[in-house]
């Protein structure tokens, strides 16, 4: 296994490692949000003050603190400050409900919640219903005299030395998607953060201190955390943070004004950007590289966007369990429509339902082995043992690999369709549909007909909604038939105005399947 990075000492604190790496960059901007800049010297000071503030409020090593925070400079301060103190930060999605936050507070047994003032009212029912003592820290304006001001923690004398943490010690949690039940508390170590930067951020993205990075994916996601904290701070780069939702116009404003050199997006955002009238010209930008993850990037979208902006999009596959991307395309060797090849330091295996390796070109379950794998799911033994199998992690994704070692996404394990006795990848059908110039977005699901057989059904968003009619449906069916095996074409095509999506922009196929049942 290729691994150019040094081995970590047993005693290791990732926050301290970042602060030490950037000690000589004190005057350089580390983070720039919508309202202020934060230099590396200020980051160092605030992180150590926040760490001291946590301890002053009685937080103990490995106790959890829930972070319900929008992307401002306070979020990296809170995250790194908790790591520095040996406390476990748990950044969570800011678009959830009070019920979701209530579950996470109880499940994590968090002793403190740090919340942005704009979200304070949303979490209030969860805080009120919390069955254990909980301290509430508010970033921004206080709404009452019971809450603790974020600024008061920063007023503490800085903690002189970090907590004596082990490289493999519980460092932080991320909650994985709960589309099939309650979200899982995915526990990661200090070492996991280090390895994602050493194996992907530095060698694959070639990040350096001269880069300015901007991630549309928020810091509470594994993808966003690496994009906008782990990787740039590991090389002394500057990060642009955006608190609002990543609409095309909001993204364009930052791309034009802040001139990032590296941009991280998701496929649905790239589609929306291409369709927007305000899409900037190449000479308005300073991009040298774009990255895509979250779901497979359609080949046509990758080719069109890269041609417009003049740089590659490196599509890849990552997961909350592996913390970031472990399969990736490379600059100068991009094959759009694939997830690329294994990131150095990671190994892949494709297996059938019996655990046997599949042949080149055949669909199999993807397993990953690498040093950034999560330690476990908190308080979920059955799910932990099903996912973390010795050195291997079962991804839940179906993939194929070609003779050149490029991996192509075939869908989630529960999305695969069996039509006429043969497996059909919905991603393959979607890619064929996306090649038609009238198709803006699409999603393919399986529907059971009156005979109990599965047929392929496509939901399509057109560039021009007026073109949605039976004739266009037949044109698209014929178009797919000419590109794929006959049994794979969609038997039904439904035209809709927009596809249901998660907060990260992933298409919610289960909602389309529910429509079918009706």
Regions found by a protein language model. Give the residues of each.
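Conserved pre-ATP/AMP-binding loop-to-beta segment of ANL
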Residues: 27, 156-175, 182, 206-212
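ANL superfamily adenylate-forming
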Residues: 112, 118-167, 182, 277
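Conserved structural elements of the adenylate-forming
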Residues: 44-52, 167, 186-208, 216, ...
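Gly/Ser/Thr-rich phosphate-binding loop
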Residues: 237, 260-265, 274-335, 347
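Conserved AMP-binding/adenylate-forming core of the ANL superfamily
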Residues: 27-72, 76-80, 97-102, 151
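AMP-binding/adenylate-forming catalytic core of the ANL superfamily
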Residues: 96, 113-115, 256, 263, ...
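Conserved AMP-binding A3 loop
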Residues: 39-41, 171-195
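Conserved AMP-binding/adenylation subdomain of ANL enzymes
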Residues: 194-212, 220-261, 276
């Amino acid at each position: 296994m290729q691994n150019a990075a040094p081995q970590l000492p047993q005693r290791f604190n990732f926050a301290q490692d970042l602060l030490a790496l950037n000690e000589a960059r004190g005057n350089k901007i580390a983070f720039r949000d919508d309202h202020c800049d934060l230099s590396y010297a200020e980051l160092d000071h605030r992180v150590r003050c926040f760490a001291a503030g946590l301890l002053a409020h009685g937080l103990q090593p490995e106790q959890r603190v829930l972070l319900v925070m929008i992307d401002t400079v306070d979020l990296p301060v809170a995250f790194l400050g908790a790591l520095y103190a040996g406390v476990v930060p748990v950044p969570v999605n800011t678009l959830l409900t009070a019920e979701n936050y209530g579950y996470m507070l109880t499940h994590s047994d968090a002793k403190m919640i740090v919340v942005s003032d704009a979200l304070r009212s949303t979490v209030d029912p969860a805080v009120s219903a919390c069955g254990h003592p909980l301290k509430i820290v508010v970033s921004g304006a206080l709404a009452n005299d019971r809450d603790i001001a974020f600024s008061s923690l920063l007023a503490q004398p800085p903690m002189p030395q970090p907590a004596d943490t082990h490289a493999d010690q519980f460092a932080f949690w991320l909650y994985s998607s709960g589309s099939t039940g309650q979200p899982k508390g995915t526990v990661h170590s200090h070492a996991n953060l280090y390895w994602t930067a050493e194996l992907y951020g530095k060698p694959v993205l070639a990040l350096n201190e001269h880069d300015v990075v901007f991630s549309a994916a928020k810091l509470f996601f594994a993808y966003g955390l690496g994009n906008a904290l782990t990787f740039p701070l590991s090389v002394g780069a500057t990060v642009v943070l955006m608190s609002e939702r990543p609409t095309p116009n909001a993204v364009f404003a930052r791309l034009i004004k802040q001139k990032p050199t590296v941009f991280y997006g998701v496929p649905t955002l790239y589609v929306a950007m291409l369709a927007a009238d305000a899409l900037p010209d190449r000479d308005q930008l300073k991009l040298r590289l774009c990255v895509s993850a979250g779901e497979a990037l359609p080949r046509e979208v990758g080719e069109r966007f890269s041609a417009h902006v003049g740089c590659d999009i490196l599509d890849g596959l990552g997961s909350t369990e592996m913390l970031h991307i472990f399969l990736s395309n490379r600059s100068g060797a991009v094959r759009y429509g694939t997830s690329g090849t294994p990131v150095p330091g990671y190994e892949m295996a494709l297996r059938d339902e019996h655990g046997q390796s599949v042949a080149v070109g055949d669909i199999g379950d993807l397993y990953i082995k690498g040093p950034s794998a999560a330690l476990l799911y908190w308080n979920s033994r059955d799910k932990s043992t099903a996912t973390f199998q010795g050195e291997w992690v079962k991804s839940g994704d179906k993939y194929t690999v070609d003779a050149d070692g490029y991996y192509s996404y075939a869908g989630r394990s529960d999305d695969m369709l069996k039509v006429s006795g043969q497996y059909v990848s919905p991603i393959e059908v979607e890619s064929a549909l996306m090649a038609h110039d009238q198709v803006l977005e699409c999603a393919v699901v399986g529907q059971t007909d009156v005979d109990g057989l599965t047929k392929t059904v496509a939901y399509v968003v057109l560039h021009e909604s007026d073109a949605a009619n039976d004739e266009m449906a037949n044109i698209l069916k014929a178009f797919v038939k000419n590109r794929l095996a006959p049994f794979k074409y969609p038997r039904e095509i439904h035209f809709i105005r927009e596809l249901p999506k998660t907060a990260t922009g992933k298409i919610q196929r289960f909602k389309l399947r529910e429509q079918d049942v009706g």
